[in-house]
Amino acid sequence: FRITDATMTAEDKAVSLNVTYLLAAGNLYVVTYKIYPNGIVNVNAKFTSTDMQPTETEVSEATRMATFTPGSDAARKAASKLEVPRIGVRFRLPAQMNNVQYFGRGPEENYIDRNHGTLVGVYKTTADQMYFNYVRPQENGHHTDTRWIALSPNKGNGLVLVADSLIGFNALRNSIEDFDSEEALPHPYQWNNFSPEEVANHDENAARNVLRRMHHVNDITPRDFVEVCVDMKQQGVGGYDSWGARPEPFHQIPANRDYQWGFTLVPVRSANQANEAAKYDYR
């Protein structure tokens, strides 16, 4: 993304910072940060629609056969529509802000199409413990239907996030890129999983669009920060036929719609004040 506009205004003893981000598909993401003298920050975000046509990607017949699943053709057609994996914001806190308390679904990780077995409640954990060590690192540790989140050190001031409506979140000791980025580690492509035609061509630029580089659980080590992802919505996991199916339509996020959501950041002296901070409507 890139910032296309940023303006600041002062009103009622508060300062509003309005930032417009242009996303790769042509959507605008407009975020307004209203900052009060007591440190409270109200965040309101709007995602605008786009009708930009997706780019068609050619896939070899060998790859189609190697990745065949029941309904795979329908899944490919569905995947050709512009969708958004998640809509939200992310920020980082010092590693000392490792203690996490939240009012949402838990204690296990859960997603919008994988959450009926988790109960809504108030849970206490740490960013370290929220990590789920999949053998192949990937998205993990998400929690849905969340009302508020408190992050704090063992002693001292903390931060409470109060949602305007139900949100999802991750709070982990790694970045998104650590788990699911081609550039996370300089591992080679696993060419034995490619078709003979693709192996013969040995085109690394083409390979990244077929089978991504793989890294493993032993490649993940905690960073010196806590990365917090706050999502209006993250699309479902899918995979109802074992591994290949797309999420159901109501668990997807079409890019041709507008979305608006928000939350408020409230500084507190300790995580024990989370319940009190969450009582108020900051909008």
Predicted features, each with a name:
Residues F1-R283:
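Beta-strand/loop-rich accessory regions of lumenal/periplasmic or secreted enzymes
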